[in-house]
Amino acid sequence: MTDIATLGEFGLIKRLTKDIQIKNPSTKYGVGDDCAVLHYPKTEALVTTDMLMEGVHFDLTYMDFFTLGYKSAMVNFSDIFAMNGFPRQIIVSIALSKRFTIEDMDSFYQGMQAACDKWQVDIVGGDTTSSRTGLAISITCIGEAAKEDIVYRSGAKETDLICVTGDLGAAYMGLQILEREKAVYYSQIEDYNKKVNQAKELHDEAKLKALQQQRQAFEDFQPDFAGKEYLLNRQLKPEARGDMIQRLRALNIHPTAMMDISDGLSSELMHICEQSNCGCRIYEKEIPIDYQTAVTAEEFNLNLTTCALNGGEDYELLFTVPIGDHEKIKNMEGVRQIGYITKPNLGCMLVTRDSNEFQLQAQGWNPLQQK
């Protein structure tokens, strides 16, 4: 493993960006000067940014650098797709401590590049700096859309149908599995260290030797995730739903409002209703949930509907369409109609399987909440 200090900031940037190939006509100049040069003569530019902090947004105990790079890019693409546009460029800034190596950053950039290649996105610039502890990542994504194609959160109208892509709650259940296995691993390490300290206090050399032989087993620890791969991928390596934007356009369906589901269905739906000055009514039985999500929620003794409503990080699309598009969308694979838009005075309601009604609560993840 190579210390980053051996290259320095500019050497690191040169190494990480040397193989970047420009793909978009709108990218006039990328990495290598004081600024990137972009040109959008006939479309609107869409700009979004996300900051990811180690220990808050990601955990390197169970996330490798390639996967981190991939996810960091994809969550930004998701915001652009949620505006009914397509991502074109990203700018990447990283603050990292001395504990990270050049090889770590190589892997991170390879993951980002894999995500960019999937949607023909150019990496056009960024910055690197040192951090006293941990890793911080900030990515700005620039996309484009024709003015008439852009979809805001504020366009939902009474009687519009509420739709979601894919299934919900899987990413949250993937996180529960990872956190459980992490807890088991650290519990075993704590128990091991306790035994080592006891043996040292007793000067028990035979016991210490036996414990030393066990150490490799901890270092090689690999949890059994058999049958849970789908849930883990939804958490660690989400896919931004640009494919659904392409399919909606092919069917000539123009959403009236749209968001990506990063903080949870309930939270995002309430954002749309607030900005569109409307209410909503969704049906518990219509919320799409994968079988593995349901099985795992039962294992953890968690309420399945709550996981789907508030789990977050699904990066599916939540959107509304005019009721006149019902015939077009009802048989669209991978899309579920879960309810409809109502008058604002009727509130945001969930109708349960037994026909009871409850006010939706925005319990999505809050990064500023004190723990």
What is each model feature region?
Residues 2-21, 63, 96-122, 130-137, ...:
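Glycine-/charge-enriched secondary-structure boundary and capping motifs
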Residues 37, 76, 84, 123, ...:
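Residue-level signal for inorganic ion chemistry
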